[in-house]
Amino acid sequence: MKKLSIVIMMFAAMLFTAANVNAQEFQQDDLLGIWLNEDEDAHIEVYKEGELYFGKIIWLKFPIDDETGKPKLDKHNPDPELQKRPSLGIQLLVDFEWDGDNEWDEGDIYDPKSGKTYSCYIIMKEYDLLKIRGYIGISLIGKTTYWTRVKE
């Protein structure tokens, strides 16, 4: 029985050590920069205004609409006036706050493919990897996507 207790304590110590090795602390402005979305068809620049963080599309893999031959527009937006604006430059991330625990929250994310806006939080998993969760109501009902940092 004594040997089993020792083995359990050693295993617990190894798990604790592994968890601490993998845990990284990031700074609030580590979010700033240019990120590639999961579909790899857009670059989003994350920037800061005051204490809040925002993100806008600065590059599209396919910026021209195949049907019109003109720059793609925000055609899925529910606001008819906003349907006329170019996709390039659309603000996707709005009003994110740093919570001090590798997470930015209290913000919204706009999905130009559906024209819908969702509550959202962002977790920095690694310096070059973001987990972005958009949701309606509670975060259990939503979608997660991952963005990678664009190397400059």
Regions found by a protein language model. Give the residues of each.
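Short, surface-exposed coil-to-beta transition loops
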Residues: 40-43, 115-119, 133, 141-144
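Acidic, glycine-rich flexible loop segments
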Residues: 109-128, 132-134
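Edge beta-strand at a domain terminus
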Residues: 129, 136-152
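Bacterial N-terminal signal peptides
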Residues: 7-17
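N-terminal helix-cap/turn-to-beta initiation motif at the start of protein domains
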Residues: 22-34
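Central antiparallel beta-sheet cores of small beta-barrel/beta-sandwich binding domains
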Residues: 32, 40, 47-110, 117-119
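Positively charged n-region of N-terminal signal peptides that target proteins for export
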Residues: 1-4
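Generic beta-strand structural signal
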Residues: 48, 98, 124-125, 149
